Amino acid sequence: MGFIKKMFDGNKKEVKSLRKVADQVQTFEEEMKSLSDEALQNKTKEYQVELQKIEDYKQQEAYLNKILPEAYAVVREASRRVLGMFPFPVQIMGGTAIHRGDIAEMRTGEGKTLTATMPVYLNALTGRGVHVVTVNEYLASVQAEEMSHLYNFLGLTVGVNLNSLTTEEKRAAYACDITYSTNNELGFDYLRDNMVTYKEERVMRPLNFAIIDEVDSILIDEARTPLIISGQAEKSTSMYIQANVFVKMLKDDIDYTYDEKTKGIQLTENGIDKAERMFKVDNLYDVKNVNLMHHINIALKAQRAMLKDIDYVVEDGEIVIVDQFTGRTMPGRRFSEGLHQAIEAKEAVEIQNESKTMASITFQNFFRMYNKLSGMTGTAKTEEEELLNIYNMAVTQIPTNKPVQRIDGADLIYASEKGKFHAVVDEVIRRHKEGQPVLLGTVAVETSEYISELLKKKGIRHNVLNAKNHEREAEIVQNAGQKGAVTIATNMAGRGTDIKLGEGVKELGGLAVIGTERHESRRIDDQLRGRAGRQGDPGYSRFYLSLQDELMVRFGSDRMSTMMTKLGMNDDQPIESKMVSRAVESAQKRVEGNNYDSRKRTLEYDDVLRKQREIIYAERNEILEKDDCSDQVKAMIEQSVRRAVDYHFTGDENEYDYEAFKNYAEDMYLTEGALSVDEISRRDNEEIYDIVMSKVMAQYQHQKEELQEQFHEFERMIMLRTIDMKWTDHIDTMDQLRTGIHLRSYGQINPLREYQNEGLTLFDTMLESIEDDVSKYILKSIIDRGEQVEREQVGKGEAMVANDGKEKVKQQPKVKSEPDIGRNEPCPCGSGKKYKNCHGRG
């Protein structure tokens, strides 16, 4: 309770501070009104001239804070002249909270788009770029189109970043002062920029300032969804089919247990026995059966926990994910870790090959890279603790311009779903007769279709908006506030379009919102309620629940069920009491708490990969920016040779195998016969290192002379290709480690610490592997001397060819996912023998 009290006290204080700023802005109103268009436009140039004199980011921020009241007044006046809209004081307050790097919580219909124009203009003056982030491309395009007139009038450029744009068009969009984009496209462009071969191919500038619309949807609801760029992995799909056939034979509570609350599934002893018999294995939990166990687990999850028309829909023979928070389908997105393939097997559609992750990032880590981050939404206060802890953004509830007139009825709870839906239909009929528009909110596609059937039987004309018919979304929402309209919508969250009341609807009580089930997130419920009573309009909302609703089943409806039985209440008699509302809210808080813990855990694990990603991307960028990477290459070669010497000549001198080292050095760095055993015998490590390095550097010089002025380009390409291939393999390895790490949570072992430690070891091994492979490629590649080598040739690896057969050449080096096994290394089969005496013979 202490945090909540502090939260609301803090909000009061913050609102007071914002009101002072709004008052200051209003003092410039008459002065701005008196300026000509040209004089008003010149204000932008004045600010920009001053900002160009300041290079330091913090000093620029201080200057922006200083000019804020006047600059906001400039935008207000320009908005009046260009758009015919004049921001209210509460919108100035919201805009100030956004500039401060916080979240402005503003109710539906309070004009968030206009509010954002002030901080967007102010921060765009620096020339560093401002990103306005929306949940879909339609909103990005519409907002950019509407607001570009204002920004262009003030001398600023506006770009829209869409998925369909070419590289050049994207670069132009990002070069603008203000760029509208979806969160997905920003994240993918960042990943793609860190996979380019030449710096000219990059499209983004350094991440400066982002304003996220529907910020809670993106930073909380989608926080755990990673953005993934993937390539095809060559894996058979037969295991998914076999696992699917097997789990269909299993019986609930006999062969496996399913926890409604956590959605966790576990095979029982009985189920394990069946699996061992079916797949003919002695011990299902043996390490060699990890892959089989994984397929059985995801097949179980697909069958039991993933529900058709709720978690996904089947469209044109494909599985399409349904966003649990918005009810929208997400074409192109796939469940990870083989779950998508398991669902494809379940639904008997074509199973697509698994993909291999080449680059990935979560929104949590992407948006934390901006210099300054802010947002706006209708509902975020309930998640302030998380937003503050993870993103360092406070949530300020901005007062409404006009008092809220909406009436929120208490929840009604019924014993069964049947009773609840009958009551909902009766309520719709009653209000529809009076001509009052009704919006019915459902949690799942299935429910919306069921209610639609009930209304059809009663002869009530209505529209359905769900994941299956999202094409008509704008049209349906536009008409939802008209007299007599009945609209059924799955999760109205993030729809981004206001429902405006038709003629004569105010007199009928405004829009009536009926929720048919509580969502596990209070924010989504609040967003549904918020569709009624916008901008001081009248409105009504009420939620109808049943003891069979998922939330009630998962969290303690037993007590209420017992109480209803004792009272002898039937299906048609609801309970309406504060106790019910408190119980529901308590259940929601528990779910939100569980989800927050899960997101926090995701972030803790993802932070391990984030630090590694930053190192790899920084290394890549350094290579891209340099014309000559020789110093980096030489450092890699030195490290590789040093490691090889220390590895082969450690411990008992009598055990030293000089022949093995000679073979290794010639295989990795030198031509055959370049090093003799006599040269290195009975010498210490430093002497051996110096001898080998002098020969290696001579070989390096030889390669340089062969390619002449193209050599530096050749080096860059080798480094980039090796880093990319090794990094891709490393992501895959880390993913497998993360999946399996929970199996170690026994005794005093902390899975996260284990993941951190092993992840670091794997990362170090990968870096060593990069050094070895870069050394081998650059020193051992055979170079075509016959013709001038073009930049594109080098890029494609065409500068490396086989020789004419006069010179004996070892096999071309390949980038492997594991380092080569030295002849004196322990054999990986676990026999304890050296590799040369075991599987390395012959």
Swiss-Prot record:
It is found in: Cell membrane; Cytoplasm. Residues 796-842 are annotated as: Disordered. Residues 833-842 have a biased composition (Basic residues). Residues 804-823 have a biased composition (Basic and acidic residues). The gene is secA. Belongs to the SecA family. It comes from the Bacteria. Monomer and homodimer. Part of the essential Sec protein translocation apparatus which comprises SecA, SecYEG and auxiliary proteins SecDF. Other proteins may also be involved. Zn(2+) binds at C827, C829, C838, H839. Its EC number is 7.4.2.8. SMART domains: SecA_DEAD (SM00957), SecA_PP_bind (SM00958). Its cofactor is Zn(2+). It holds the Pfam family SEC-C. Gene3D superfamilies: Helical scaffold and wing domains of SecA, P-loop containing nucleotide triphosphate hydrolases, SecA, preprotein cross-linking domain. ATP binds at Q91, G109, E110, G111, K112, T113, D498. This is Protein translocase subunit SecA. Its main location: membrane. It is a peripheral membrane protein. May bind 1 zinc ion per subunit.
